[in-house]
């Protein structure tokens, strides 16, 4: 009976509040104001949410809306309006002329819980704290000087992982050994990110010692849970009055995961503090957590310094590992499905590097086809097909339309980068298009913005553009690659914050360079 009474009360409250909801959220706009078009099919209360849950991926559904409604339109996501941009010129307008209006991220359950109450840089509101933290990360982790000092980390990880792959082939004593390259790349990129940030390695023969075995097994699982949860759909982000129900159990799982992460990062932080007290490290040997300890000694950032350190390190690991892994997995998948492109890449490596030594960073400037492969991969499979959402802070005008404060901005990079008005045969894999077309990926050429643009663009663009070609070149140079039975690679995608391949990437692998390169 108590449950029935509670239900009656909820229903009464619902019908009392429903007219208010329609008045404030669905009221007709001023006829003098030109507003963006809106796709048909919105329902009361939930808006267009049901259309985004029809089985296809959100960026593809929004692309189909653009085909019918034009390159810019608005949709209703529960209590929130969103402006969806599907055109490079309009994206340019958002990220240049009007960038000052799009500097905030939307609030949400994941941002609050897993972002340590919005302390993490990627979800922090725009203001003095965000500006100061971004400056610290850019200077102390992503500056040319710091990247130069960190190069040995990714060189070492690529070398170690390649040697382990060679040993696997050697141990099996067969022409080709079968490897899930998706998992291999996930292990490599997570090792790389964690090593740069906290000096740890978790996979392979050179990983943690026996006393760290539990930590070594728990860390990857917990971090990948966080990757998944940060990109999960939480209904209460769009219908806040349902949060108390925790439909789907996301909030409970987020709290459990962030608690596990906090224990992990606190242990690392305490370890770094102990080493610091016992004499510390030379500047060139310091990882990012060491650097942050020094900087935060005299911090005036307005938050608990340990929380700032943990969230800064977590943000870099999250931002680096999964996006790099996903891009490299797509790059290999596309090459395996296009053997002529794979042969061209390996011929280029043989010409400029040979088969008696490993690829060096100094070789990359000559490897123009490898560079074109990276660009074409990021064009077809951007790490985040929908760029990180933003919130309009003031009323503004975009593409001639009035956009109200509080509206969310969704930029469909996937659609922009397949625009037939910009790209010939936009859905075809053609790395050659970038041999004659001078386009960079740093956010200034708006037809190719896989890392975003404006002040909220991914700060680690420079790091990604060094690690991606070097890693891919090492793999293609070091190993012959083919699919079992010459089958096509399954290119099914997963939903989520990172645009990842849904299925394993099973590849037959054999060395193609001198064995001395793996010693």
Swiss-Prot record:
Pathway the protein takes part in: Aromatic compound metabolism; phenylpropanoid biosynthesis
Protein's name in the database: Demethylepipodophyllotoxin synthase
Record field: catalytic activity: (-)-4'-desmethyl-deoxypodophyllotoxin + reduced [NADPH--hemoprotein reductase] + O2 = 4'-demethylepipodophyllotoxin + oxidized [NADPH--hemoprotein reductase] + H2O + H(+)
Applied value in biotechnology: Combinatorially expression of Sinopodophyllum hexandrum (mayapple) genes of the podophyllotoxin pathway (e.g. DIR, PLR, SDH, CYP719A23, OMT3, CYP71CU1, OMT1, 2-ODD, CYP71BE54 and CYP82D61) in Nicotiana benthamiana (tobacco) results in the production of the chemotherapeutic compound etoposide.
Tissue-specific expression: Rhizome-specific expression.
Keywords: Heme, Iron, Membrane, Metal-binding, Monooxygenase, Oxidoreductase, Transmembrane, Transmembrane helix
Any GO MF annotation of the entry: heme binding
GO annotation, cellular component aspect: membrane
Cofactor entry: heme
EC number: 1.14.14.132
Localization, UniProt: Membrane
One of the GO BP terms on file: phenylpropanoid biosynthetic process
Membrane topology category: Single-pass membrane protein
Top-level EC class: oxidoreductase
Residues annotated to bind heme: 458
TM region positions: 6-26
Family recorded in the similarity comment: Belongs to the cytochrome P450 family.
The keyword Transmembrane helix is assigned to this record: yes
InterPro entries found in the cross-reference section: Cyt_P450 (IPR001128), Cyt_P450_CS (IPR017972), Cyt_P450_E_grp-I (IPR002401), Cyt_P450_sf (IPR036396), Plant_Cytochrome_P450_Monoox (IPR050651)
Functional summary from the UniProt entry: Cytochrome P450 involved in the biosynthesis of etoposide, a chemotherapeutic compound of the topoisomerase inhibitor family. Catalyzes the hydroxylation of deoxypodophyllotoxin to form epipodophyllotoxin.
Entry-linked Pfam families: p450
């Amino acid at each position: 009976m108590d449950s029935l009474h509670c239900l009656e009360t909820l229903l009464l409250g619902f019908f009392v509040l429903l007219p208010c909801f329609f008045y404030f959220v669905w009221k007709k706009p001023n006829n003098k104001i030109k507003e963006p078009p809106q796709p048909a099919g919105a329902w009361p209360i939930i808006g267009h949410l049901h259309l985004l849950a029809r089985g296809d991926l959100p960026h593809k559904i929004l692309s189909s809306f653009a085909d019918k409604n034009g390159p810019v339109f608005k949709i209703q996501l529960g209590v929130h309006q969103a402006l969806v941009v599907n055109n490079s010129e309009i994206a340019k307008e958002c990220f240049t002329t009007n960038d000052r209006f799009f500097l905030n991220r939307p609030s949400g359950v994941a941002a609050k819980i897993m972002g340590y109450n919005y302390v993490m840089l990627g979800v922090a509101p725009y203001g003095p704290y965000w500006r100061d933290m971004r400056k610290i990360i850019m200077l102390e982790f992503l500056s040319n000087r710091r990247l130069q000092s960190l190069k040995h980390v990714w060189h070492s990880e690529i070398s170690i992982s390649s040697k382990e792959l060679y040993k696997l082939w050697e141990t099996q004593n067969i022409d080709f050994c079968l490897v899930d390259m998706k998992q291999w790349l996930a292990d490599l990129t997570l090792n790389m990110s964690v090593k740069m940030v906290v000096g740890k390695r978790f996979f392979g023969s050179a990983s943690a010692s026996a006393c760290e075995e539990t930590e070594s097994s728990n860390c990857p699982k917990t971090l990948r849970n966080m990757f998944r949860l940060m990109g999960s759909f939480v209904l209460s982000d769009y219908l806040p009055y349902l949060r108390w129900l925790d439909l789907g159990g996301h909030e409970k799982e987020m709290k459990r995961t962030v608690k596990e992460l906090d224990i992990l990062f606190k242990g690392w932080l305490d370890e770094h503090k102990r080493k610091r007290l016992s004499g510390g490290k030379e500047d060139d040997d310091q990882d990012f957590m060491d650097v942050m300890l020094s900087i935060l000694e005299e911090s005036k950032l307005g938050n608990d310094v340990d929380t700032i350190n943990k969230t800064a390190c977590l943000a870099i690991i999250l931002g680096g590992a999964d996006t790099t892994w996903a891009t490299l997995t797509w790059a290999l998948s596309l090459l395996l499905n296009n053997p002529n492109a794979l042969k061209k890449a390996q011929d280029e490596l043989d010409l400029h590097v040979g088969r008696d030594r490993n690829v060096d960073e100094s070789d990359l400037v000559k490897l123009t086809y490898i560079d074109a492969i990276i660009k074409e991969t990021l064009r077809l499979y951007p790490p985040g097909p929908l760029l990180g959402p933003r919130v309009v802070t003031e009323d503004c005008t975009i593409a001639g339309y009035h956009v109200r404060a509080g509206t969310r901005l969704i930029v469909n990079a996937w659609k922009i980068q397949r625009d037939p008005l910009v790209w010939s045969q936009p859905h075809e894999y053609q790395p050659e298009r970038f041999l004659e077309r001078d386009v960079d990926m740093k956010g200034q050429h708006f037809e190719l913005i896989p890392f975003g643009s404006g002040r909220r663009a991914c700060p680690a663009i420079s790091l990604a553009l060094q690690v991606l070609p070097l890693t891919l070149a090492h793999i293609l140079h070091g190993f012959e690659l083919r699919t079992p039975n010459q089958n096509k690679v399954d290119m099914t995608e997963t939903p989520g914050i990172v645009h990842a391949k849904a299925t394993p990437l099973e590849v037959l692998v054999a060395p193609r360079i001198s064995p001395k390169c793996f010693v």
